[in-house]
């Protein structure tokens, strides 16, 4: 019933009408004071049958509500990042961390900018020792430099391991740098050597 929408601004009226066409009632959100962008994200979430009510409030921007809906849609623990004191980019970094199954408690602090959170998250995804650069004293740009340096060091170590050998339970397979020759080094601990 659009008559209940009476004096709504055009944007809110459009969202009300679009929701009504889908059989969704967003009247309580309009009465609560949500703006047009928030109503759009709420309507979109409700169209997907996502239960966003426990996690949203009118103080959040539409983009924050979208991040919450994305997390619910992916069965993530939304309450770990649906923090009204964080901006939507910080919420996105926390959601991305949960999607990649990393421990977001390492950067779960609103004192980090979203760019700093991203650098820590990327380091965790790459299994780097982020403790070396996660200090608040580093800017996101400095964190990026530290992360890239750690990645280079890790790649060099991996390349060296590939050149020198691969460890198995009872022997080590050694190859030269060009992998043109291979040698097997047998471990006496794992083998029965006849006397």
Range-by-range predicted roles:
Residues 1-195:
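General marker for long, soluble alpha-helical cores
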């Amino acid at each position: 019933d659009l008559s209940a929408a009476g004096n709504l601004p055009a944007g809110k009226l459009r969202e009300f009408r679009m929701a009504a066409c889908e059989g969704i009632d967003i009247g309580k959100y309009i009465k609560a004071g949500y703006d047009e962008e928030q109503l759009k994200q709420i309507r979109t979430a409700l169209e997907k049958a996502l239960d966003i009510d426990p996690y949203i409030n009118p103080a959040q921007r539409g983009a924050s509500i979208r991040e919450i809906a994305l997390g619910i849609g992916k069965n993530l623990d939304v309450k770990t990042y649906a923090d009204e004191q964080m901006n939507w980019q910080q919420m996105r970094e926390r959601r991305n961390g949960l999607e990649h199954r990393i421990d977001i408690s390492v950067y779960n602090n609103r004192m980090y900018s979203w760019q700093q959170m991203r650098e820590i998250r990327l380091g965790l995804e790459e299994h780097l020792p982020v403790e070396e650069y996660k200090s608040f004293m580093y800017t996101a740009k400095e964190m990026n430099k530290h992360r890239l340096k750690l990645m280079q060091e890790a790649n060099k170590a991996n390349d060296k391991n590939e050149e020198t050998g691969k460890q198995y339970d009872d022997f080590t397979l050694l190859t030269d740098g060009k992998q043109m020759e291979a040698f097997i080094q047998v471990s006496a601990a794992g083998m029965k050597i006849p006397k």
